[in-house]
Amino acid sequence: MKRKKIALIGSGMIGGTLAHMIGLKELGDIVLFDVAEGLPQGKALDIAESSPVDGFDINLTGANAYEAIEGADVIIVTAGVARKPGMSRDDLLGINLKVMEQVGAGIKKYAPSAFVICITNPLDAMVWALQKFSGLPAQKVVGMAGVLDSARFRYFLSQEFNISIKDITAFVLGGHGDSMVPLVRYSTVSGIPLPDLVKMGWTTHEKIDQIVQRTRDGGAEIVSLLKTGSAFYAPASSAVAMAEAYLKDTRRVLPVAARLSGEYGIKDMYVGVPVVIGAGGVERVIEIDLNDNEKSAFEKSVNAVKELCKTCSALAPNLKE
């Protein structure tokens, strides 16, 4: 059986980490692409030379031309500028929008049947623009945000309760920014909702509020610690989980930035919601019931994304809202 082909557009910290993780899982042959000459080739060779030690059999190549992504089954986009201390994700918009236009054109020409995962920030606006620029069906273009934000939420909860991360389910709605909505009511420990655990004395409302805020600030916390860049291990793991669900048709329920077509009262916008990912891409959007507080927080998050998309349209007139 022919091996799958996975193209990684952007060979920085996330791109290199993605290549290594995908290699270890043997999900398919890998093409690392970057505009910087030598960077994708060097990383591809370095990771390939680890394969005899780690015992994985895949082909790894590096390239500076979009022709190399031709026929890719999955494309993961990390190209663009990363955050530095003091920057918000939104500060990157103007620069990275131009990058998305180039990437979208490359995908449209060489890999129009691919499943595309965008990681570039500001995420919700960039994946919206990338889908427009590429012309791919909306169900085949998604943004990686919710899996990462939910993972951070789950990790912080596991630390608070001192229990296995495997027993915690939690997810985050909305945009990938300061207005994201970690859903406390829908988060559980072995099926026990967080509000019930507060009643049982496991934690307090104040501590849960602190964890929610730390989740919102999760990316900024790492940026301030690293000082020279942003997170790359957890974002890469999150994107691999999404790619694997598509390639293996596991129909996993994952929170991703997906284009909505009336769900949650929203049309033609990418926002973080739980979806089913399988061989068809986004096979179903799960519309959960929100109370008044959750609705209000979600609407605030959606409005923040809407403003970013308006800015994108002003900067690139060929984008239509």
From Swiss-Prot:
Gene3D superfamilies: Lactate dehydrogenase/glycoside hydrolase, family 4, C-terminal (3.90.110.10), NAD(P)-binding Rossmann-like Domain (3.40.50.720). One of its GO terms (biological process) is lactate metabolic process. Catalyzes the reversible oxidation of malate to oxaloacetate. It comes from Bartonella bacilliformis (strain ATCC 35685 / KC583 / Herrer 020/F12,63). It comes from the Bacteria. It catalyses: (S)-malate + NAD(+) = oxaloacetate + NADH + H(+). Keywords: NAD, Oxidoreductase, Tricarboxylic acid cycle. The active site is at 176 (proton acceptor). This is Malate dehydrogenase. The keyword NAD applies. Belongs to the LDH/MDH superfamily. MDH type 3 family. One of its GO terms (molecular function) is L-malate dehydrogenase (NAD+) activity. Coiled coil: none annotated. Its EC number is 1.1.1.37. Substrate binds at residues 83, 89, 121, 152. NAD(+) binds at residues 10-15, 34, 96, 119-121. Pfam families: Ldh_1_C, Ldh_1_N.
